């Protein structure tokens, strides 16, 4: 179902977000 897929994707999205945060900060002037 959509709910189970969303629950599986949520922790992955959080990991990607944490990984992207320092990259985004470094990219900013």
UniProtKB/Swiss-Prot annotation:
One of its GO terms (cellular component) is extracellular region. GO terms for biological process: defense response to bacterium; innate immune response; killing of cells of another organism. Keywords: Antibiotic, Antimicrobial, Cytolysis, Hemolysis, Immunity, Innate immunity, Secreted. Thermostable. Still active at 100 degrees Celsius. It is found in: Secreted. Female-specific peptides with potent activity against Gram-positive and Gram-negative bacteria. They have as well hemolytic activity. Homomer of four to six subunits. This is Ceratotoxin-B. It comes from Ceratitis capitata (Mediterranean fruit fly). The gene is CTXB.
């Amino acid at each position: 179902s959509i709910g189970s897929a969303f629950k599986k994707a949520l922790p992955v999205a959080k990991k990607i977000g944490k990984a992207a945060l320092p990259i985004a900060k470094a990219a900013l002037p």
